[in-house]
Amino acid sequence: MALPQRPEEVSPEWLTRAVGDHAPGVTVRGVEVVASHEATNHHAVLRLDHDGGARLPTTLFCKLPPLDPVRRTRLDWSGMGEREVRFYRELAPGLDVRVPRVVVAAHDGDTGAFVLAMEDLRTRADVPDGTDGLSPDLVAAGLEDLAALHVRYEDAGRRRREAPWITPSGRTSDYGARLLRAGIDADPGALSPAFVAVAERYIADRDTLQDAWEAGPATVLHGDPHLGNLFVAGDRIGFYDWGLMAVGSPLRDVSYLIAMALDPADRATHERDLLTHYREVRAAQG
């Protein structure tokens, strides 16, 4: 069954077959593209007419390869689409981590096409818009879930058995250094001297930082747990956008979540306590 590569190609007939594992016997009678835009991938919101009741959402968020050919080439090279599909199919069911309810996770190894169709999180959760940070308590809860992921895969043998397709991110790309250089050059006055100093140090010698990351214990990482990849449901947070999973130091996830999910004032006040909390949770989980 060929995979659709544009939102309008997600037909009722295709979706009926695709959701068969998740909701067998459900017939999708209609699909309406409510919204569509290009991001790292191509995103669309689909409204469904179906006979499955609560077994299938009536609104789906759909992630497809980007339509722009340059972006598509970069995405295919990165393996992000396949990695995220495999996460939802192979790992997510066994993890004690909150993730979206996914009804289609498919990848075509010959063409690089992929489809991820999941619940529209806005119907049951708060999806941050990036203007405000999360509370320290929510970040602490998120660190507990990351700790569960990290503990599960700190054993190299288990990683080889369950997730051999997740590998170290390596250091072949200078994308981060180029992005920092462009930001500094575009408007240096908008950045604090402290930030510029750290950025310049990274640009000049990023291998030293990479050496430090690679020196310690390794595990499977989410890889990109910033505020835009989180949702809040009750007193817990959940994680989505798993396309940058990698093997590396667990402190990459920990530091990234603390730095990117808290307001600066909260981070200054609570970051040490949060690091201690993560260590205690790790120790309690073995």
Language-model segments: residues:
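Conserved NTP-binding catalytic cores of kinases and kinase-like/nucleotidyltransferase enzymes
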Residues: 1-111, 233-237
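Glycine- and acidic
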Residues: 70-74, 127-132, 240, 256-264
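Active-site activation/catalytic loop segments of kinase-like enzymes and analogous catalytic loops
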Residues: 86, 251-285
